[in-house]
Amino acid sequence: MQFPLVKNSEGLDVTVSEGNYLLNMTSNDRLLRRNSFKGLMTTYHKYRNTLANTLSSNCRVSAFYATAHKYHDTLEACLSEDNIPPSLYDGLIETVHENLKPLHEYIALKKEILGLDEFHAYDIYQPISNAADSFACDFDEAKVKVTAALSPLGYDYHAALQEGFDKQWIDIYENKGKRSGAYSWGIYGVHPYVLLNYQPRYNSISTLAHEMGHALHSYFSNKSQTYINSDYSIFCAEVASTTNEILLLEHTLKTASPEQKIYLLNQFLEAVRTTVYRQVQFAEFEKFIHNEINEGRTLQAEMLETYWLDSNKRYYGPALTVDAELASEWSRIPHFYTPFYVYKYATGYSAATAFASAILENKPKAVEKYLHFLASGGSDYSLNLLKTAGVDLTTPLPVTVTCLLYTSDAADE
């Protein structure tokens, strides 16, 4: 697939690719954003029929295995690994539908702040604050900031965090031949290992908190569980990491300047948008395409494009001007080839906001329950572990609170 060169506002050619698309979308150069958006989407549009057939075939394979293993459908088959009832999946979509107003308000607010007559999909990622560089600090200072932010988790967590810092669990900096990004790897009987590519900016500080959340989840689980029960599910994995991110943000807000607060709150609002709303939008699309296959129909590009445009209108509201090119976006989402996976991002984020809120509000035994959750590993089904710790995802409350309380409060500020 060959993507075009596009012009920026200075008339210079800029490469468009999946690798730099997000970088272009966060540029303050609106012409570059617009041209990158149209260049990428029109390229995918050329292959719309091939990609629709590929996705259709993938769904048929999943449906075959679901039937062969005596499941009602692909949804039930995919959720069975974590013992998640399909009603939770449907309830998640329904709850987000009932709470789309905060997202509509956020899009309208961002349109107003940016002073745009029309707000397009290529405007969504534009920063509304230039304060990112003001958070620059070296790694030693980043460790101090993360340690202070996570102090509400108590002595045991602090001691384990300090052990990770002191005993060099972390490969910190970019290096020749080193992979990009960041991740944590837990190994039973050995301390966790963390890979970073640290840069002096807030996102890297947040990544440190995030990955140490994974690492200490593994640390407490391995310390408390047998080998068989030590490995926690993906459904639970992002809870520990995201809780740390939220605690860091709340801590940083306390001493932030007005401009820094705008940056931080926008970071949080974007996290809610991309991790809850957008992932549930994906989850709803997945349900649609697999239902089509279950009904014996083949996925057609026109059908998928129509559904995707309607979905964006519903989710983002009247403040978003929906361009025709947006219809092709479904074809560039690789998660759709791993059926019914993305909903876990939304449930994980919602659980994390519930834990962080309870901890910061000093609710009775909130820290004790949370640490018990970390130490429980995979000793029970995910929903049971979370419910024991005080977060019941079989009810709409955690998702509703995430959509309403956090998003609305942040937008108001």
Predicted regions located by residue number:
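Long, well-ordered alpha-helical segments
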Residues: T50, T54-T74, L103-L114, G213-K223, ...
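Auxiliary, metal-adjacent structural segments of Zn-dependent hydrolase domains
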Residues: D133-Y188, R201-Y202
